[in-house]
Regions:
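Short intrinsically disordered terminal tails
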Residues: 1-2, 7-11, 70-73
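Acidic, low-complexity, intrinsically disordered interaction modules
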Residues: 16-72
C-alpha cells in the first residue's frame, strides 16, 4: 500500500460511512518540507485499512509527520 494525499484519503473516507480516521502507527517522523515528501512511499498492507496519508503536526520539539489511516475497524 502507498501513502496517498489527504484529499484522496478524505474522498475514500466519505465513500465509506462506517470508516474512521485512526493513527497508522505510534511513531513520529521528522518533517521534510511538505507532505509530498511522503506521498507515494510504501507502507505495510494491513487488513481493514483503506488508505494511509501523512499529516503535519507540531509539538514543543517542532514539526513532525504523523501517518494517519482510514480504517473500517
Amino acid at each position: 500500500m502507498r501513502i496517498i494525499t489527504r484529499g484522496e484519503a478524505m474522498r475514500i473516507h466519505q465513500q465509506h460511512p462506517t470508516s474512521r480516521l485512526f493513527p497508522f502507527c505510534t511513531g513520529k517522523y521528522r518533517w521534510h518540507g511538505s507532505t509530498e515528501a511522503y506521498t507515494g512511499r510504501e507502507v505495510q498492507d494491513i487488513p481493514g485499512v483503506l488508505a494511509v496519508f501523512a499529516e503535519r503536526r507540531k509539538d514543543s520539539f517542532g514539526p513532525y509527520v504523523r501517518l494517519m489511516s482510514v480504517t473500517l475497524n
